[in-house]
Structure formats: C-alpha cells, structure tokens
C-alpha cells in the first residue's frame, strides 16, 4: 500500500503543476486595452470601439463592443405544470415565435431575480411561486458585456392582467411539457439564452 501511494504521488504533483500552469496561462491571455471610445450611445444601444493588444503582441486597432445591462429570462411553471410562454414578433429575424418571459434589469431592480419577477408580472400577469437561478450565461461573450440570468419559477399563478409597456405586442400562452419538448426538438425557439436554460432544466428534472 505504501508503495502504491509513493508511486502515485509524483503523478498527482505533475497534474497539480499542470493545473497551476493552465490557470496562469488563462490569466495571461487577457487582452490589454490601449484606448477606448464610444461610437454610439442611446437608450437601446451603446457601442464602443477599443484598440486592444493580444498576449502575442498583436494589436487589433478596431474591436467593437456592445454594452448592455444584465438580462433575465424565466422558465415559469404553474401549479398544474403548464409552462408560461409568450408569442411575439422579432424584427431582427422577421419572425413571430414562442419565447419565455424575458427582459432587462432596470437600475431600480434590487437584483436579477427582482427584475425577472417584475418582467414576468408585466408581460404575463403571473407571479408568486418558488424561484431559483439555474444558470448565468452570455449571449455573445466576444462582443457583448452583459450576462443573462436564467431562473425557474414553479407554482406561479395568475395574479393580475398583464401590464405590457408601449411598444410591446405579445400574447400569453400556457403550454404543456410535451408542447415545450416539441418546440425544442423542432428548433422553434430561436433565443439561444432561452434554449440553454430550458434544456438544462429538462435534463436536470429528467424530463427529456
């Protein structure tokens, strides 16, 4: 037994050293910002142009970054196991699609969960229930500064009529698990930041 541990130790130390080197290497890969300027700023779009230097020494004189506030999306499920979806037109792809309730974290929101609760109530009129965050992801890590906080809310119920903002034109739909599965399998849900948490939730709950 003693010989086994003696024989194992060098390999363990080598692996530990490898992890340390890998972590250091990852830390050293961060780009250096040489200069930065805003090229567009308004309510819905803030674009920044950076001049950056890579760890290799190469310089990219024009690297464009889009600054956004944090986003939220919610898998809301009623007490009778129906999924709360909305259906709306998305001008970017020119299509009307089923989506989860989602939105932006406002400065007045105390937390991403508070923002998600507000968005669910405003868009669908549903609220209450038990909430947990399932993942935090990036829609485009190479060019966007924000993250999407993804929640699951179970046992939600209709507490009021929707309070949709001007410019919002959507309808509320309650879908069964089979209908959600079908949407996913047929690639009918186009928002990547909604597809990811849906697959994760269904996988964790062994519903696929």
Regions found by a protein language model. Name each.
Residues 1-11:
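Hydrophobic alpha-helical membrane-insertion segments
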Residues 7, 14, 18-21:
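Short, positively charged and aromatic/hydrophobic N-terminal segments
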Residues 18-42:
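Extreme N-terminal tail/first-helix region
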Residues 23, 28-30, 63-68, 73-118, ...:
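Conserved Nudix-box catalytic region and its N-terminal flanking loop in Nudix hydrolases
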Residues 23-31, 96, 133, 142-145, ...:
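Nudix hydrolase/Nudix homology domain
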Residues 35-73, 79:
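Acidic, metal-coordinating catalytic segment for phosphate/diphosphate chemistry
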Residues 48-56, 140-159:
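Active-site-adjacent beta-strand/loop module that shapes the phosphate/pyrophosphate-binding cleft
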Residues 49-53, 76, 152-154, 174-176, ...:
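Short, well-ordered beta-strand micro-motif
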């Amino acid at each position: 037994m003693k010989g086994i541990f003696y024989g194992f130790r060098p390999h363990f130390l080598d692996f530990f050293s490898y992890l340390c080197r890998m972590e250091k290497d990852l830390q050293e890969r961060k780009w250096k910002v040489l200069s930065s300027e805003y090229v567009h700023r308004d309510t819905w779009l803030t674009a920044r142009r950076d001049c950056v230097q890579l760890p290799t020494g190469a310089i990219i004189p024009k690297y464009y970054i889009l600054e956004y506030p944090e986003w939220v999306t919610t898998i809301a499920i009623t007490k009778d196991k129906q999924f709360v979806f909305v259906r709306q037109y998305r001008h970017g792809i020119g299509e009307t699609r089923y989506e989860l309730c989602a939105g932006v974290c406002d400065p007045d929101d105390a937390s991403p969960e508070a923002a998600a609760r507000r968005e669910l109530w405003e868009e669908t009129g549903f609220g209450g229930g038990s909430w947990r965050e399932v993942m935090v992801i990036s829609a485009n890590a190479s060019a966007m500064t924000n993250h999407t906080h993804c929640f699951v809310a179970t046992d939600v119920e209709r507490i009021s009529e929707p309070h949709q903002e001007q410019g919002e034109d959507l309808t509320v739909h309650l879908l069964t698990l089979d209908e959600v599965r079908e949407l996913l399998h047929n690639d009918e849900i186009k928002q990547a930041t909604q597809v990811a948490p849906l697959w994760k939730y269904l996988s964790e709950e062994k519903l696929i």
